[in-house]
Every structure is written in C-alpha cells, then in structure tokens.
C-alpha cells in the first residue's frame, strides 16, 4: 500500500517571529507568532510542522530552543527544527526540547561526516538534510549555503545522492527560484530527485494553490509538500488542501 502524502507548513523564523521572503531575500512580511501559528496548523490537520531559523547559519548560531520548547507543549504533530545546526550537541538539545527531527543544511555540506555521525547516534529517522538550490543556466541546480547567500558549485542532485547514502532519513529540497513566488514548484527538480534517491523528498518553494501541491506530489513524485505563503496568507487551510487532494485520488491522512 502506498504511503500517504504529507502536507507540512513551514515557519521561517527571524527574531522570534514568522516571516516570509520571496526568493530568499525580497519583500519580507511578518506572518505572526510561531507557536500560535503552529498550534493553528495542528488544528487544521497538518501532518508535520517545520521551524527554520533563517538567519542562524549566517549569524553563526543555532536555532532558538525557546520557540521549539513552547511549541512542543501545544502541538501534537511531529516537529522539525533547523537553522545553524552544526554539531551533534545541537541535535541532542533539540530532541530533548521536543523536536522529532532536526534539519541540517550548511554544516552538512561543509562537513559531510556530520550526516553519518547524527544518523549513527540518533537514527536516520531523526535527520532531515535540507538543500537550497538554484537553477544553473547550463542545466541542473546548484547548492547554496547560509540561507541562500553562498553558492557552492555543487550539483544539487549529486549532493542529494550523497546525503542519502550517508544516512539522511529525508531530504527537504527548496527551489530558490520558486521560493515565495506562489507560481508553483520546480517540477523538473523534484522529478530528478525522485529518480536519484531512495529516501523521501519534501518539496519546497513555490506553492500558491492546491493545484501546485497536487502537481508536485503526482507529476513531481515528491513524498511531501512543504508550504508557507499559501497558509500564512489565509488563502487556504491545510484541511482545504487535503480535501482537494483526496478528491483527486491522492492518499492523505485525515
């Protein structure tokens, strides 16, 4: 029996507030309190919730524990936290504070052995490797670090393969070109990832409608859809998106 597709609201946090950027850097707007929003999305039927401290890696610090611990008291779906995770000690602290999974991005590229260490100590099921990438003019996608500020020259699909091989339980892959545009996911990117790796892929960047989410879960073959603007704006609820998918034959949890 196929696994249910997951709908995952993403809360980008800066200075204790949920914000939303466009293509990682333009037109930031304040979407509210992270704990209140997480609790609301839990009520709406979210399968999981992701907290990303979007400036943590650039500022050389780890993500806030306060938001996580408060959310864990009020939210009853799995929580993932990321942003500035660069050591096993960070992972241990987040799991103790209530996280179910920890997302690692920049530090994993800089020191790939970190993936092996986390997977060995805590299990692959706790580890999400996040990949931010941008289309190359010559084809393919390039990995960027530090919240999209630093190009690496690394091919995103090749890095996804290595991360999965080293022990990532899931991959959270964001198209920087599509991020915040509400113009749809980069379907070709997610098709390429589905062909390349055997671990679940969470698609991120570009959701503007239930149709966009349907497309990335079916045509793009993603295992889960991460979305922010579509929910923060109030245009759609998680429940509405799930009902839309269910009516079109996509298996989702109630």
From Swiss-Prot:
Heterodimer of HisH and HisF. CDD domains: HisF. InterPro entries: Aldolase_TIM, His_biosynth, HisF, IGPS_HisA/HisF, RibuloseP-bd_barrel. This is Imidazole glycerol phosphate synthase subunit HisF. It is found in: Cytoplasm. IGPS catalyzes the conversion of PRFAR and glutamine to IGP, AICAR and glutamate. The HisF subunit catalyzes the cyclization activity that produces IGP and AICAR from PRFAR using the ammonia provided by the HisH subunit. It catalyses: 5-[(5-phospho-1-deoxy-D-ribulos-1-ylimino)methylamino]-1-(5-phospho-beta-D-ribosyl)imidazole-4-carboxamide + L-glutamine = D-erythro-1-(imidazol-4-yl)glycerol 3-phosphate + 5-amino-1-(5-phospho-beta-D-ribosyl)imidazole-4-carboxamide + L-glutamate + H(+). It is an enzyme of class 4 (lyase).
């Amino acid at each position: 029996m196929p696994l249910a597709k997951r709908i995952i609201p993403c809360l980008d946090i800066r200075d204790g507030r949920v914000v939303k950027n466009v293509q990682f850097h333009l037109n930031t707007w304040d979407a509210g309190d992270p704990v209140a929003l997480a609790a609301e999305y839990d009520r709406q039927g979210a399968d999981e919730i992701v907290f990303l401290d979007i400036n943590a890696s650039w500022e050389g610090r780890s993500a806030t524990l306060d938001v996580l611990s408060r959310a864990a008291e009020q939210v009853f779906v799995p929580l993932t936290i990321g942003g500035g995770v660069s050591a096993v000690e960070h992972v241990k602290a987040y799991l103790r504070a209530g996280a179910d999974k920890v997302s690692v991005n920049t530090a994993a590229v800089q020191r790939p052995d970190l993936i092996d260490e986390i997977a060995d100590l805590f299990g692959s099921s706790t580890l999400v490797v996040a990949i931010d990438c941008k289309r190359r003019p010559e084809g393919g996608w390039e990995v960027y670090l530090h919240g999209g500020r630093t190009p690496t020259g690394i091919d995103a699909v090749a890095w996804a393969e290595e991360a999965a091989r080293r022990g990532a339980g899931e991959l959270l892959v964001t198209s920087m070109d599509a991020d915040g545009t509400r113009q749809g996911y980069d379907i070709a990117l997610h098709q390429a990832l589905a062909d390349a790796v055997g671990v679940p892929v969470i698609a991120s960047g570009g959701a503007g409608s239930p149709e966009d989410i349907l497309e990335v879960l079916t045509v793009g073959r993603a295992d889960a859809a991460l979305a922010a603007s579509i929910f923060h704006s109030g245009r759609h609820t998680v429940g509405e998106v799930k009902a839309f998918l269910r009516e079109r034959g996509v298996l989702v949890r109630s």
